[in-house]
Amino acid sequence: MAKNYYDITLALSGICQSARLVQQLAHQGHCDADALHVSLNSVIDMNPSSTLGVFGGSEANLRLGLETLLGVLNASSRQGLNAELTRYTLSLMVLERKLSSAKGALNTLGDRINGLQRQLDHFDLQSDTLMSAMAGIYVDVISPLGPRIQVTGSPAVLQSPQVQAKVRASLLAGIRAAVLWHQVGGGRLQLMFSRHRLTTQAKQILAHLTPEL
């Protein structure tokens, strides 16, 4: 059966978008608010109509992730910011594989996400309450699966409880995207052997987005 590289690229961009948000938060203490909203919402939408539906039904919602994916696929250096993004992306993939083989953790994750949906009736998606709840899910359900993702950035910035919560919530969104990536036929070997296919697909999607003004 032929791989659907459109869906695979969208899901992979979702992982990369989360990685980029983590990087922005860790270095600057803030991040692209629209991209964060899209990524956080992907965790809560349990019944999307399509791969694109997970990310709000618009390719433009993944612009940050698509641009990050191209940087990761074409990174010539193992140092610096692209190396950080590659490490976060690969680490999320490893954790997702551990999650997929831990039935108890999967069940707990589903229950906790249902709890988030109830909280959304009373709190905004980017409120401190929801952010802390998502961070708590990451700490309680995902982190124990190991290995832990080492987030690097500004020590002063990373001391902030609000930044820590947003980082963990973004990592949870990355796990969601990694689950989706496997569901649509993604696999780590593609990063080695299908780089050109993924790069071409990402460029094609970005080409029909309206330029940012």
Curated annotation (Swiss-Prot):
<keyword id="KW-0175">Coiled coil</keyword>
<keyword id="KW-1003">Cell membrane</keyword>
<dbReference type="InterPro" id="IPR035932">
    <property type="entry name" value="HflD-like_sf"/>
</dbReference>
<feature type="coiled-coil region">
    <location>
        <begin position="79"/>
        <end position="122"/>
    </location>
</feature>
<dbReference type="Pfam" id="PF04356">
    <property type="entry name" value="DUF489"/>
</dbReference>
<dbReference type="GO" id="GO:0005886">
    <property type="term" value="C:plasma membrane"/>
</dbReference>
<dbReference type="InterPro" id="IPR007451">
    <property type="entry name" value="HflD"/>
</dbReference>
<protein>
    <recommendedName>
        <fullName>High frequency lysogenization protein HflD homolog</fullName>
    </recommendedName>
</protein>
<dbReference type="GO" id="GO:0005737">
    <property type="term" value="C:cytoplasm"/>
</dbReference>
<keyword id="KW-0472">Membrane</keyword>
<comment type="similarity">
    <text>Belongs to the HflD family.</text>
</comment>
<keyword id="KW-0963">Cytoplasm</keyword>
<keyword id="KW-0997">Cell inner membrane</keyword>
